[in-house]
Structure formats: C-alpha cells, structure tokens
Amino acid sequence: MKVAANSSKMLAEKLELMKGGRRRRRRSRRRRRRSRRRSRSPYRRRYRRRRRRRRRRSRRRRYRRRRSYSRRRYRRRR
C-alpha cells in the first residue's frame, strides 16, 4: 500500500511540474516579459539594420536588375 501511495504522489508532483505549478508560472511569465522588452528595444533593431546594409551592398555588385524586386519583396514581408 505504501508503494502505491508514494507512486500516486510522485505522479501528482510530476503533473504539477509539467503544468508548471502556480508559483513557477507567475515567475516565468514575469521574467519572459521583462527580458523580451529589454532585448527588443536595443539589440534587435541594431542587428536588423546591420544585416540589411550588408545584404544591399552584396546584391548591388552581383545583381543590379534583381535588386529593385528584392527590396520591394522585403518591405512587404517585414
């Protein structure tokens, strides 16, 4: 009987951990929101600008006619 009782308790604890218990959920959500706000504003904007400049320079040298089409498509997507 003891073994069965322990196994049921272990299963209940595992389910709570998988669901992410109330305490853990609140902490994780707050941390994620803060980290996303901080990372989006300074880091991602600089990174995207650098990437676009590099791609435009490389495409000007290789494909002069296709450049206009690629720029229009990028603006529509992003």
Curated annotation (Swiss-Prot):
GO terms for molecular function: DNA binding. Residues 1-21 are annotated as: Hydrophobic. Phosphorylation occurs at different degrees. The triphosphorylated form may be predominant in T1. SP1 appears to be phosphorylated in elongated spermatids, but dephosphorylated in mature sperm cells. GO terms for cellular component: nucleosome; nucleus. Residues 20-78 have a biased composition (Basic residues). Testis. GO terms for biological process: cell differentiation; chromosome condensation; spermatogenesis. Residues 1-78 are annotated as: Disordered. It is found in: Nucleus; Chromosome. Cuttlefish spermiogenesis is characterized by a double nuclear protein transition: histones -> spermatid-specific proteins (T1/T2) -> protamines (SP1/SP2). The protamines compact sperm DNA into a highly condensed, stable and inactive complex. This is Spermatid-specific protein T1.
